[in-house]
Amino acid sequence: DALLMALRLNEAPVLRAVYQRVPVAEIPLLAAALPEPYLKRMLQLIAAQTADSPHFELGLRWAEHLLLNHHDGIAQARASYAPVLRAVHQAFSVQMTDLAKLCHSNHYALAFLAPSHVGLVEPTAMARVEKGEK
């Protein structure tokens, strides 16, 4: 009920607060029960929150369940949903790029630190593959 009221009010701070406080276990139920008129607004919220927030998995779960439950309606109105779906895709792409950069940075930092502790650190699967070991 709080989510629907926040969507009706359409106030950004209220929407953000309600969106972030929804328990993850309730997302599938709320996504299935979300009325069609609020779907586009909810997808816009996901795009905005994913771009501005560190709660990446929360956005992924919302998007997954909304798309699974409302795919027929979205497919029938492809043209009207195209901009918001592009915005969601763009937000996830930016997060994915940032996450990939962080992973590469950590990988190289560990590679730099690991030789200084020879014998203390077991070689990683990646290092064994690079050396041709199994």
In which residue ranges do the predicted regions lie?
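Solenoid-repeat scaffolds in large eukaryotic assemblies
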Residues: A2-L3, V14-L15, M42, G59
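Long, low-complexity, highly charged intrinsically disordered regions
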Residues: D1-R8, E130-E133
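Short, charge-rich amphipathic alpha-helical segments embedded
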Residues: L4-A33
